[in-house]
Amino acid sequence: MIPCSDRIIRNAPGPFDAEVVLDYESRLLRRKRLACAGGDFMVDLAEVASLEDGDAFALSDGRIVVVRAAAEPVLVVRGPLARLAWHIGNRHTPCRIEADRLIIRQDHVLEAMLRRLGAEISHQNLPFRPEGGAYGHGRTFGHDHGHAHDHHHA
């Protein structure tokens, strides 16, 4: 019988029996069969979860499998960061914010817009670990954040 996990250990301390490497999209899941060096296992969570690098699955056979963020194509953005971050956020685009750069997933439309705004952009392959959002762990699921308001997107 294939081992199963219905529990995530957030920011797991280790030690780990195996690791599973997932890209950003694959780290959003509820029910899925995953493969690691120790064999396949089934994830069966009560609700959809956004997994972060360092979270882990507690398997029914006692093993702990840590999640690692896979390297994937990203845009590394430098320039007037406050202005660039505002435009990225206005489009509800997941973004990693660092002291001297922003990191977003590759998108040719956003790349063209950011270049017009004065950004210097390089294409790299890095683990994508965007900011989690103000209203919950990991991603923001939709746009509802507990209050009503009107705003318009440019």
Curated annotation (Swiss-Prot):
Main location: cytoplasm
Pfam families in the record: UreE_C, UreE_N
GO molecular function: nickel cation binding; unfolded protein binding
Record flagged with keyword Cytoplasm: yes
BP GO terms, sorted: protein folding; protein-containing complex assembly; urea metabolic process
SMART domains in the cross-refs: UreE_N
Intracellular or extracellular location(s): Cytoplasm
GO annotations of cellular component type: cytoplasm
Region (Disordered): 135-154
CDD domains recorded: UreE
SUPFAM superfamilies: Urease metallochaperone UreE, C-terminal domain, Urease metallochaperone UreE, N-terminal domain
InterPro entries, alphabetized: UreE, UreE_C_dom, UreE_N, UreE_N_sf
Keywords, comma-separated and alphabetical: Chaperone, Cytoplasm, Nickel
Similarity comment: Belongs to the UreE family.
Purpose of the protein: Involved in urease metallocenter assembly. Binds nickel. Probably functions as a nickel donor during metallocenter assembly.
Protein name: Urease accessory protein UreE
Source organism of the structure: Paracoccus denitrificans (strain Pd 1222)
